[in-house]
């Protein structure tokens, strides 16, 4: 079982490469980049990834499962948690790139406005093509992720 080799094989499968219109939004206590509109290509890529890499996933501990169950999950999300180790996959997947840690409610609006203004000022920030996958590792819940591998996605060739 070689995760890096599987990442490269997965990325080499020709597919429609997703592109999203990014937007800065508040997600619960965090602020994140999200897709302004649904992307079937991105949803398919995410679903394919969940299934392709599930064999590398560490099973949830009873404590981790209990914490997730306390979040008010739907029946489908509980089934996803038990089968895939995470409740927000497939129909419940929502693309996001978290920009902040938790922000108190009284500050969240002003931080959101600031980040939206900064983001809007970036030239070319209104289309975000997804062309690479990164393999990240987090050694402990409280530590940052670090990149341990990357692979370029392979686009479906247009008929000539």
Regions found by a protein language model. Give the residues of each.
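Histidine-dependent nucleotide/RNA phosphoesterase domain, centered on the 2H-phosphoesterase fold
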Residues: 1-160
């Amino acid at each position: 079982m070689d995760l890096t080799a599987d990442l490269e094989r997965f990325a080499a499968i020709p597919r429609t490469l997703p592109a999203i219109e990014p937007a800065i939004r508040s997600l619960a206590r965090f602020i994140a980049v999200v897709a302004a509109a649904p992307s079937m290509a991105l949803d398919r890529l995410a679903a394919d990834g969940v299934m392709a890499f599930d064999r590398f996933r560490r099973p949830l501990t009873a404590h981790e499962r209990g914490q997730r169950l306390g979040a008010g999950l739907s029946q489908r999300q509980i089934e996803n948690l038990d089968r895939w180790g995470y409740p927000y996959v497939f129909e419940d997947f929502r693309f996001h790139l978290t920009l902040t840690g938790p922000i108190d409610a009284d500050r969240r609006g002003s931080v959101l406005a600031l980040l939206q203004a900064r983001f809007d000022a970036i030239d070319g920030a209104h289309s975000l093509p997804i062309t690479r996958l990164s393999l990240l590792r987090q050694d402990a819940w409280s530590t940052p992720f670090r990149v341990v591998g990357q692979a370029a996605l392979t686009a479906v060739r247009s008929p000539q």
